[in-house]
Structure formats: C-alpha cells, structure tokens
Amino acid sequence: MHHYPIFLKLHGCRCLVVGGGEAAARRAGDLLRAGARVELIAPVLAAPCEQLLDTSPGELHHRAEPFAAGMEEGAALVVGASGDEATDRTVYEACRARGIPVNVAGRPSLSTYITPVQVDRSPLQLAVSSGGAAPVLARQIASRLETLLPAAYGRLARLAGRMREQVRVALPDKDWRLRFWEQIFDGAAAESVLAGREAEGEAELLRLLEQEQARPAPQGEVFLVGAGPGDPDLLTFRALRLMQRADVVLYDRLAAPALLDLVRKEAERIPVGKRRGRHTLPQERINERLVELARAGKRVLRLKGGDPFLFGRGGEEIEGLIEQDIPFQVVPGISAAQGAASYAGIPLTHRDYAQTCRLLTGHRRAGHPQMKAHAPYRQDETLIIYMGLVNLEAVCEQLCECGLPPEHPAAVVAQATTPQQRVVLGNLRTLAERVRAERVESPALVVVGPTVQLHPRLGWYRGEAEDRDAAASIDPCWTGGMRD
C-alpha cells in the first residue's frame, strides 16, 4: 500500500485551485461541496469556472493573476490544474516547502496526495483509487459501486448518526454496540429506511434498542474457520462473513498474511501457529484461550489453514468448547491437499492412474515417521503426506521398505496456491536430495503416486518462484510412462 486512505475535514478551510479550465472547475466544485472556501488562481477563467463562480458567491473567489510562490501560505490544501508544466511544478515545490498537501491533476509524481473517485451517499462516502496507476479502472469500479448502492443508503447513514449517542449511552460496551448495529443494518429497520419508510425504520430501531437493554450482555461465540490453502480467493463466503465480524482472531502460521488482511481491522490478532515443534502456544493453552475469550463476550475467530478437521486439531478444540457450553460454528475450508493438487496439476485420482487417495501425516514418533504403520501401499494410489518435509528422506525410505519401487513418482508442492508456489518433481529415490538442493521450505505437502507424472502436462499454475522447466526433473527411470 503506497497511499494511506484518509478523509479530510475541510469545512471553512481555505483551499487553492491553480488553473482556470475544466479540470480546475471540477476540482473546485468538489472542494465547495466539502464546505471549503476556494480560491481560483488563474489570469483568465474558461466558461466552466465562470459558471461555477456565478453559482457559488461568497465561497469561491478568483485571483486574476498567475500563481507565485507565497500564495499558498495559510492554505489547508492546494490543487494544481493549470495544465502548464512550469506552473504545476512551481505549485508543487512551493507547497512541499511549506508541508501543504498538494495534488497536480494527472501528475502523481508532483502530488503528495491522490484524489480518489468518489461514490457519494452523504454522509456515507466511498472512495476508489489506483494510486494514479490506472485512473480509468478506478472510475469503472466506482461506476459499478454506484449501481450497487441505492441513494437511500445516505438516509440510513443519517439515521444511524442521529441515534449514535443514544445507542452509546444505552449499550456502554463497544462490542455489544457493534453487534447491535450489525443487527440493525442486516434487518428490518434498514430495509424500511431503504424502502423510503424512514419513520418506520426509526421506530424499529428504538424497539430493538429497548429490547437489547432488557437482556443480559450477549454471550461470546467461537468461529472455527478453515482458511483454505493460501489464495484468499479460495475462501468461502461464510468464512469471509465471519472474519469480518470477529472481535479477536487466533491464527495459525499456515494462514497466509493476505488472509489476515480480510479480518475486521479492529479485531485483536493473536498468533498461535506451530512450526517444527516450536509452538507459540501449546494446544492445551489454545483450547483454554478460546474458552476464556468467549466467556468474556468476544466473538472469537479461530483461523486455521486448509480445513480445520483435516490434521488441524479442530476436533480437539471444539471438544473443549462443548465441555464448557460455549456456542461455536465450524466453517470447512478447501484442504491443503485439494489446493496443492489442483494448482500443481496433479490429480488425486485419475481413471488411468490412481483409483484411490490416502491422506497421511509424516510426523515423527519415537524419532521416526510412522509410514510403516499404514502399509501396505499400492502403486495405483495417490498418497498426500502432511508435515512430511522435515522427515522427507526417512518418509521416502520407509515407503520403499514397504514395497514401493525407488522409481515411484513423488513431488513436493510448497506454498500451494500462492504466487510463491513451487513444485519439485522426482521419485522416492531422488526427491529428498532435490528438495534440499532447491531449499524448499514449509508449508509443503508431499505427493506420491503415478499422477505426479501428469504435472508437466496439467500444471496450469506457475508461481513466481517455480522452475518453469520442472518437467525435466521427472526421473526417466520411472517405468509407468504417460498415456496419451
């Protein structure tokens, strides 16, 4: 993010617009609507500026002279819209010297702020900006928003503004107030206002407020949410909805940073991720924290990579909630296995190659992975091994000891579904060495089975870090061959 979005209160403030053409008229009109006192600085005004001057007496003034350094003194904001390179640069340099925010129309390099495209439903305002990179795209997005937001949303926002102090006094707890307003904006009160029945909507709001005061403070709740394999676009609608309503989030290391950006901005963030035996919080303490936070009335988001019930200890966590009578919801996610297989072009099953798929863990017990406990293995099945990267060499050796040939195809898919995705191909004999050479890091899945050989043909997604010549890494000694 190269620009910090902000709304300025300019009511009664002196603002300068340097220029006398159509662009200057547009910018001056926007500032006047925000309540600013505007000075147009230009030797001559074109017709749009003259018309604006005629319709805005008292708040818009014209200085019929060229801009000179010093005119900006005391201004809250300056806009350069002369279209003249030398004048615009003088405006920019003069304002920079005094620390005055300045924007030169169409010149991001001569601007300390960007004027966004606006969707005005006053007092509700939306702003869309590309940071000057793609203004046409920003306008198109704003146009779509215009069609999605009825003008009545302004009336709804004004009603909320009138009632805000009364609600604050009636419901002193901020989390309680948040839930109340969510109930209002999602319910019949808002629908009435949007339908033009504002008095009816206000009456419904007051009825719900009285009802809310009469009940005890709302109980907390836990949302156990599967965040999917990494790509934020793979979140479910329900997951995103609950992420936007959470008061606090406990998140795993596997949840990509981009996913956390989608959680409600005001929510407290608590990292509880695990990495190769190093736990930010032990599992027992995570279970306790979920109960403690919910009992404090919080809506707690437990954000887990992949699916919470697939090697995610989701069952352990909800057992504790059930014992303590804490309400909860479980939202499944696309599993890491599904995401990695789909984005790597390695089918979990295929009519010609693999009729079954097994999901296993490569965790060690007594110092060794327990692959032998799941034998026998078939050559016409796909194995997805979670947490197998750190013990990869031992995992491959044990699979061979259980009867799979050393030439059996195998792959590691790291950072699946993200721009950092990497796929390393080999077989049970060569994979561990290739992964070491490539310095692959977790999160990663190990995939073993004949469908691995389909990656060069079906691997549609290439991460920025992935070797584009990955097809060459398939060991030619594997005898299964590819079918046309």
From Swiss-Prot:
Recorded metabolic or biological pathway in which this protein acts: Cofactor biosynthesis; adenosylcobalamin biosynthesis; precorrin-2 from uroporphyrinogen III: step 1/1; Cofactor biosynthesis; adenosylcobalamin biosynthesis; sirohydrochlorin from precorrin-2: step 1/1; Porphyrin-containing compound metabolism; siroheme biosynthesis; precorrin-2 from uroporphyrinogen III: step 1/1; Porphyrin-containing compound metabolism; siroheme biosynthesis; siroheme from sirohydrochlorin: step 1/1
Substrates-to-products reaction catalysed: uroporphyrinogen III + 2 S-adenosyl-L-methionine = precorrin-2 + 2 S-adenosyl-L-homocysteine + H(+); precorrin-2 + NAD(+) = sirohydrochlorin + NADH + 2 H(+); siroheme + 2 H(+) = sirohydrochlorin + Fe(2+)
Sequence positions that bind NAD(+): 22-23, 43-44
Superkingdom of the source species: Bacteria
Record-listed Phosphoserine modification sites: 130
InterPro entries: 4pyrrol_Mease, 4pyrrol_Methylase_sf, 4pyrrole_Mease_sub1, 4pyrrole_Mease_sub2, CobA/CysG_C, NAD(P)-bd_dom_sf, Siro_Cobalamin_biosynth, Sirohaem_synt_dimer_dom_sf
Active site: 252, 274
Record region (Uroporphyrinogen-III C-methyltransferase): 220-484
Enzyme Commission code: 2.1.1.107, 1.3.1.76, 4.99.1.4
Family annotation (PANTHER family): SIROHEME SYNTHASE (PTHR45790:SF1), SIROHEME SYNTHASE-RELATED (PTHR45790)
Annotated function: Then it catalyzes the NAD-dependent ring dehydrogenation of precorrin-2 to yield sirohydrochlorin. Finally, it catalyzes the ferrochelation of sirohydrochlorin to yield siroheme.
Protein name: Siroheme synthase 1
Lineage: Bacteria, Pseudomonadati, Pseudomonadota, Gammaproteobacteria, Chromatiales
